[in-house]
């Protein structure tokens, strides 16, 4: 990088190469050295990343196709790591011309007049990445460029001179990676202009045709939903994008947990003072899995991985708020804290008509309930099967206590000691947990005691009501009778 003139650069035997060759050769080194070039991308090791590596080795332009929250843009940004750390360019060039292969009038003129004394500068790979979100208002001038009348007047040039062109984002991404997010949102006529650049290597601005063999690695991202809702990718352009790679959501709870743990932004105080058991972490992830197969949610829109990240952050913050209000120095996440993640869920799901009728909050609570029911069978016997077996039902004493008219409210106003006292009121609840999980800490035992109540409610053995900042548990049939009685009273009021 000490070289500052073209002559000095030539003396080092520097060889020019295209950005796609650069990516390919650096990827070959990475693969041979068994290094990781896409750090932080989890769950794609056997699917997306091998296909992406193949596309780079083939020197293809790439389309990443997938639902929202599948790391498409992040993958594109990480491709920068495969570029050389620094590359030389003709100093002063708007489009960072290669000193050994100039394409702009400015660079050619500089080299023609100054020869080996032409000044060169060095461009870091972080500056060789350009990203544009496709929106309906994007114009050809934004992407490709336009004639600049002020420049023409100032330099006293005619519109036939290429120096009057003000280059757009794509020419300025020469020798770089250029990413267009949500490609179908781009108007068809602008997509055609892109196709022309990919195919013919020239640009046309207001009738001015300029041969400009740009060296660009194009990466496009798109959501399959866009093909039917907002727009489509024009066929000639899609045909010129050589590799289409399908992304996907995490295929297991373990992978999903790793992503959430990596992306969730927690403070040092939250990490130190708030304990989150593996059960509640799994529940947060299971909620997303339930959402991805729910009849209330538009599956074409998808359920982003951001849902679990936001939900986990809210879960920790709900526990933190409870801790601060009660004046305690530390706490652990309870299942009742799941009431605090409802805003994170409702903001991340697109409902179909049936879901709109139910309401976002009701759909969110339904998803939480389904997640509890799915995981409950991994920790305890199925309550429905337990009733039919000849062996003693482990839940009989618990349900009978509620049948006698007792109830338990678990809200965010309870301190840790009050929380323990409320759960210990239920006979045999502690013994049931210890029977199946004898080696747990006190906090884990209390968590599973509450989990049993939630699980029995999901299996219709108990009634669960959403309270402000928590849940209330009571007898199933008693709550149904009270609900019917309240309805009769309401009818009497109107007679």
Q: Language model features by range: what are they?
A:
Residues 2-254, 265-282, 295-299, 380-495:
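Conserved ASCE/P-loop NTPase catalytic core
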Residues 31, 147, 291, 319-322, ...:
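Generic structural signal for hydrophobic core residues of well-folded globular domains
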Residues 75-78, 83, 99-110, 225, ...:
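Hydrophobic transmembrane alpha-helix bundles
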Residues 260, 284-288:
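Short alpha-helical scaffolding segments that buttress acidic/His motifs in well-ordered protein cores
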Residues 270-277, 290-367:
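C-terminal helical "lid" subdomain and adjoining coupling/linker elements of P-loop NTPases
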Residues 332-420:
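Extended alpha-helical coiled-coil/bundle linker/stalk regions that scaffold oligomerization
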């Amino acid at each position: 990088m000490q070289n500052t003139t073209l002559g000095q650069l030539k003396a080092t035997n520097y060889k020019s190469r295209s950005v796609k060759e650069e990516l390919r050769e650096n990827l070959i080194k990475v693969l041979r050295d068994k290094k990781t070039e896409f750090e932080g991308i989890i769950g794609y090791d056997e699917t997306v990343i091998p296909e992406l590596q193949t596309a780079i080795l083939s020197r293809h332009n790439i389309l990443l196709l997938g639902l929202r929250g599948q790391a498409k843009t992040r993958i594109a940004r990480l491709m920068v790591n495969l570029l050389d750390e620094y590359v030389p360019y003709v100093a002063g060039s708007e489009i960072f011309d290669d000193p050994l292969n100039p394409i702009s009038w400015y660079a050619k003129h500089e080299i023609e007049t100054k020869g080996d004394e032409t000044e060169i500068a060095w461009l870091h790979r972080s500056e060789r990445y350009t990203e544009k979100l496709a929106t309906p208002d994007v114009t050809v001038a934004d992407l490709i460029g336009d004639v600049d009348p002020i420049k023409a007047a100032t330099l006293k040039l005619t519109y036939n001179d290429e120096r009057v062109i003000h280059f757009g984002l794509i020419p300025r991404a020469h020798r770089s990676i250029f990413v267009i997010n949500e490609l179908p949102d781009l108007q068809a006529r602008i997509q055609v202009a892109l196709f022309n650049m990919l195919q013919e290597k020239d640009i046309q601005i207001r009738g001015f045709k300029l041969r400009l063999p740009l060296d660009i690695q194009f990466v496009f991202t798109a959501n399959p939903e866009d093909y039917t809702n907002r727009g489509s990718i024009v066929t000639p352009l899609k045909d010129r994008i050589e590799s289409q790679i399908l992304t996907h959501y995490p295929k297991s709870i373990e992978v999903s947990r790793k992503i959430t743990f990596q992306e969730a932004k927690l403070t040092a105080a939250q990490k130190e003072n708030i304990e989150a058991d593996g059960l509640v972490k799994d529940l947060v992830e299971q909620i997303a899995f339930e959402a991805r197969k729910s009849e209330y949610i538009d599956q074409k829109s998808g359920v982003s991985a951001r849902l679990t990240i936001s939900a986990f952050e809210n879960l920790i913050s709900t526990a933190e708020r409870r801790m601060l209000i009660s004046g305690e120095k530390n706490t652990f996440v309870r299942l009742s804290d799941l009431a605090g993640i409802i805003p994170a869920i409702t903001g991340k799901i697109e409902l179909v008509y049936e879901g709109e009728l139910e309401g976002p909050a009701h759909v969110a609570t339904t998803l939480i309930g389904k997640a509890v029911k799915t995981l409950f069978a991994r920790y305890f016997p199925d309550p429905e099967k337990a009733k039919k077996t000849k062996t003693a039902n482990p839940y009989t004493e618990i349900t009978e206590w509620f049948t006698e008219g007792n109830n338990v409210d678990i809200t965010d106003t309870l301190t840790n000691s009050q929380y323990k006292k409320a759960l210990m009121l239920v006979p045999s609840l502690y013994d049931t947990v210890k029977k199946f999980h004898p080696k747990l800490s006190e906090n884990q035992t209390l968590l599973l005691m509450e989990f049993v109540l939630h699980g029995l409610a999901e299996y219709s053995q108990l009634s669960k009501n959403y309270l402000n900042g928590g849940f209330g548990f009571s007898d199933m049939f008693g709550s149904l009778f009270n609900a019917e009685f309240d309805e009769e009273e309401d009818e009497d009021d109107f007679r």
